[in-house]
Amino acid sequence: LKSYPKAVVAVSHDRMFLDNVVDVVYEIEYGTARRYPGNYTNFIARKKENYDKQMKDHIAQQKEIERLQRIVTRFKGKPTKTSMAQSKQKAIERMVIIEAPDKYDNKTFHANFQPEKETGNDVLYTSELAIGYDHPLSVVSLDLKRGEKLGILGGNGLGKSTFLKTIVGKIPALSGEYRFGTNVQIGYFDQQMAMYTSNKTVLDDFWDEYPNLTETEARNALGAFLFSGEDVFKNVNMLSGGEKVRLALCKILKTRPNVLVLDEPTNHMDIVGKETLESMLKDYKGTLIFVSHDRYFVKKVATQLLVFEDGTTNLYQFGYEQYQEKLDREASESKNVYRGNAIFGGAISQNGGSQKGRGE
């Protein structure tokens, strides 16, 4: 798409894709379409700048109007000051009013999701851990410490979800070992939870997990994950995939685990949902292990990166940026080799042609 010579219109929740491909963003919000030159990251920065400037100008203008209005009120009844009052009134009337900017979509999860207790410093250790079903898909060795956030990337079918299922005890390891440290309490999100079905309401479904809560306590917990008002009486089967993810996360985080294991938590979320979850996980004081295809999300949240590649795994202890540097370096080296081969091949062809000419 970057090399396509004609226009491209793309609708996407993939922010990395938008960063890499587009050179202008149109945002449709509050019934208005606004144009922002540049990619997605540039759009976010410009939107914030525009919001801040408009709010600053709006506040300044309102203060000036109030100041002028006080003068008008003070002097409009005094004959010697009537002209001054009229002048200030006209100044107010001539102003082009700067409206307050539309609010950001500032919906955020506001639960107390921080761990109830700390783990020891050593959280997860794996040594030559072979994961898979009939045969090994990958082998994983790592040593994860308290508070670290491990993002996991890789192609389909290489064992990312299988690794998570193995360490939470859903399936057995084929060989090798893994162990968790002391005081570990795991909260596990399976991507299939986004497909969860139930004929119950959101409130009743949540109550099944926490029957000892009062209605007020249950509704407060759900409200923290954006289920407010009549939303709690929606049938679970009528929820979107993103709403089901929020319900699942609410159930999980209500236990306040100190280790979160999440398998593709953003798959069904829109950009606002992803950015809200990003903010929550960045603030999370426990240890995080998560699989995601969303590179933008991984880059924002992960402090370390584990990449699954054709039966092997590589750990990047400095996160996504270190991995990207490696990809850029390999791409540059490959390009140089290609250029070298092209030049070398051209030289041989020219020599061959010269020799052939002389022979003739």
Task: Tell me the role of every PLM-derived stretch.
Residues L1-K56, K107, A111-E360:
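ABC ATP-binding cassette signature C-motif
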Residues K47-I71, F75-P101:
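Intracellular alpha-helical coupling/juxtamembrane segments of multi-pass membrane proteins
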Residues V25, P101-D102:
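Short hydrophobic/aromatic segments of transmembrane alpha-helices and their interfaces
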Residues T80-S83, D105-N106, S161:
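Short low-complexity stretches enriched in small and charged residues
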